Regions:
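The feature captures the beta-strand-to-loop junction immediately N-terminal to the Walker
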Residues: 44-46
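P-loop NTP-binding/switch modules centered on Walker-like glycine-rich loops
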Residues: 183, 187-262
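A short, proline-enriched helix->beta-strand linker immediately N-terminal to the Walker B motif
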Residues: 168-172
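Helix-to-loop junction immediately C-terminal to a conserved catalytic motif
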Residues: 59
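Charged, flexible cofactor/metal-binding loops and thiol motifs
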Residues: 236-331
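Conserved ABC ATPase signature
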Residues: 149-153, 157
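Conserved ABC transporter NBD signature motif
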Residues: 67-78, 86
Length: 331
């Protein structure tokens, strides 16, 4: 199988507290997934699930405790041994478009600096032509961009500018960490539609990190659902979100707002102040919230089970698969 990015058993452990009360939290726990060329892969889950920490390790901002990251593609060749550096092949955009740019600098300077750092143009004329090309790709023009400060743009425009800057190096992989969460609702679809356009027209792959299942469903080819450092379900987005197998995925799915003025958003999702406890749980980390939890769930870590093209980390399906295999043996 042709893959662009492979994450293999990635783990990140943080030590919290003082010397006498130090606790080790596995913020990312044995996470594995891959991204194919010309694919949008979503890494989704609620705040604190470990998705951003995973992205930071892929980008080299955090050192993994263990595991491997391999990026294939780009002029840097194959990068491994736990880090993928910012090269021509891998670029990123982040949650806050206003925090990306210094308010006292015109945005042009960021583009010219990137071009200079990577040697992307022989002279100023070539640089301007390259900037125009990338701005046009995200629906902007050089005239409306040149000489302006970040405060002169809307959040949606700044996020498009961030994407255009990332495209300067012709990356094969774009890591987008909550790229629409701080953009007006009316502009969110324009950003996710841009990802789809770039995938279809230039073969760009996107690792789309989000808590928003609605945009994940719309834009992604495959999706992984994270909970307390674990991937609990992964597969084609249509299968995972329209017919969720893991109890946590079902809970997230039910929390998506409906066209009902009497129903408050999130009224079905039960969130408690147990994040710390869930990270330290001996068995399944979701057992404290799960309506199907058994004593086994509370004491033993579930293994990955493959149901057709969907991966599920749940004792319920592990026992079902054992029963099925036993019946086949008897037959």
């Amino acid at each position: 199988m042709d893959t662009l990015l492979e994450v293999d058993r990635l783990t990140k452990v943080f030590s919290l507290g003082g010397i006498l009360s130090r606790v080790r939290i596995r913020a990312v726990d044995n996470v594995s997934f891959y991204v194919k060329p010309a694919e949008i892969f979503a890494l989704a889950g609620e705040s604190g699930c470990g998705k951003t920490t995973t992205a930071r390790m892929i980008l080299g901002f955090e050192e993994p405790t263990s595991g491997a990251i391999v990026h294939r593609g780009g002029q840097g060749g194959e990068s491994e041994n736990k880090k993928v550096w910012f090269t021509e092949g891998v670029q990123a955009i982040f949650q806050d478009p206003f925090g990306t740019f210094n308010p006292l600098r015109i945005v042009d300077r960021y583009f010219f600096e990137t071009i200079g750092n990577f040697g992307l143009a022989a002279n100023g004329k070539e640089a301007v032509k390259l900037i125009e090309e990338k701005l046009n790709a995200v629906g902007l023009s050089y005239d409306e961009f040149s000489g302006k400060y970040p405060s002169e743009f809307s959040g949606g425009q700044l996020q498009r500018i961030s994407i255009a800057r990332a495209l300067l190096t012709d990356p094969t992989l774009l890591i987008a960490d909550e790229p629409v969460s701080m953009v007006d609702a009316s502009l969110r679809m324009s950003i996710v539609n841009l990802f789809k356009k770039l995938k279809e027209e230039s073969g760009l792959s996107v690792l789309y990190i989000t808590h928003d299942l609605a945009t994940a469903y719309y834009v992604s080819d495959r999706i992984a659902i994270m909970f307390r450092g674990n991937i609990v379900e992964m597969g084609p987005v249509e299968r995972v979100l329209m017919d969720p197998q893991h109890p946590y995925t079902r809970l997230l799915r039910e929390s998506i707002p409906e066209a009902d003025p009497k129903k408050r958003w999130g009224s079905r999702i039960t969130l408690s102040n147990t994040e710390h406890e869930e990270y330290l749980r001996a068995g399944c980390k979701f057992a404290g919230r799960c309506p199907d939890a058994t004593e086994t769930c509370k004491s033993q870590v579930p293994q990955d089970v493959h149901i057709d093209d969907v991966l599920v980390k749940c004792h319920k399906y592990h026992s079902v698969m054992k029963d099925t295999s036993s019946s086949h043996c008897l037959a």
